[in-house]
Amino acid sequence: MKPFPRAEISRKALQANLARIRELAPQSKIMAVVKANGYGHGLLNVANSVATYDQGADGFGLARLEEALELRSGGVNARLLLLEGFFRVTDLPLLVQHHIDTVVHHESQVEMLEQAELTTPVTVWMKIDTGMHRLGFSLAQFDAIYQRLLACHNIAKPIHLMTHFACSDEPDNSFTQAQIDAFESVTASLDGDRSLANSGGMLFWPQSQRDWIRAGIALYGVSPMVGDKGGNHGLVPAMELKSQLISVKDHQAGDSVGYGAFWRARKDTRIGVVAIGYGDGYPRHAPEGTPVWLNGRRVPIVGRVSMDMLTVDLGLDSQDKVGDEVLLWGSALAVEEVADHIGTIAYELVTKLTPRVAVALLP
């Protein structure tokens, strides 16, 4: 018997998305970004699905060292990059031992590299802040820091170079081009690989594609742009979040449903209860009208989302019954559409599922 709620992860979809990304960026290597438990899809589920498919992903991007070590212990031998870099000097021997690249974005990391005693140099990606103003060295700092990295015996040469876009999901926003130009202004004559494009850069700013692209949300079949869908770019949703009806009851006009008697039926209707709630990661603030997919149609959420359940207005003439499968998002109901209704982004929905949701990797 299948558990509910459950997230079904399609290996076929992940592989199809990898192939599509190669079509979109044919001259670049692909770094599959699998941080945050593979964007909620399961770290090893994703990595093993795309590590050896066709050419396979050329590398994997992680946020934390623990994620990289999990990939290594899971048998993934591809190139790994810590996108936030290392946090402690004691992390450095682990980078050497497990052949893990690191971003360097702050002078404190440079100091740790200069002071460490390592048996083998570490491969470094110098992050340049071209306008995101989160991590990275400013353009004014660049030359001095780059020279220190060149002089450091604990750093493998050449030094690789990267930046991160603030607005790449906005095709009409010239800020991304300004970031590209800023990056080129300080790196044009230097050796080493370059990585500028994230999913938004790959899709909407092809001129940002360099040696490596960092494919995050696109790998999972989702568009980074609000109001857009991955399917518009030939991408396939990799996750289907499913549950089932556990109650179907008739209610009269004026009956309230849920905590706070927040919603009242405007006419006689039939209410279904779905076994999923904010304890599973479905947002409590989902407003009335947020759709779920049931028996071939969109059905609106009514009342407040509870910890373990949410309620939907089936309509008085519906034939839905207890045990019927409910799709919260997936192929028939894009996660981007659900996110738009809720007032969030698809990234947040897929990454916030809790351990109560069973995750199953399908062929």
From Swiss-Prot:
Catalytic residue positions: K35, Y259
Residues that bind substrate: R134, M307
Cofactor: pyridoxal 5'-phosphate
Gene Ontology cellular-component terms listed: cytosol
SMART domains attached to this UniProt entry: Ala_racemase_C
Xref: SUPFAM superfamilies: Alanine racemase C-terminal domain-like (SSF50621), PLP-binding barrel (SSF51419)
CDD domains per UniProt: PLPDE_III_AR_proteobact
Catalytic activity reported: L-alanine = D-alanine
Pathway info: Amino-acid biosynthesis; D-alanine biosynthesis; D-alanine from L-alanine: step 1/1
Annotated positions of the N6-(pyridoxal phosphate)lysine modification: K35
UniProt function note: Catalyzes the interconversion of L-alanine and D-alanine. May also act on other amino acids.
NCBIfam families to which the protein is assigned, alphabetical: alr
Family, per entry: Belongs to the alanine racemase family.
Name listed for the protein in its UniProt record: Alanine racemase
Organism lineage string: Bacteria, Pseudomonadati, Pseudomonadota, Gammaproteobacteria, Alteromonadales
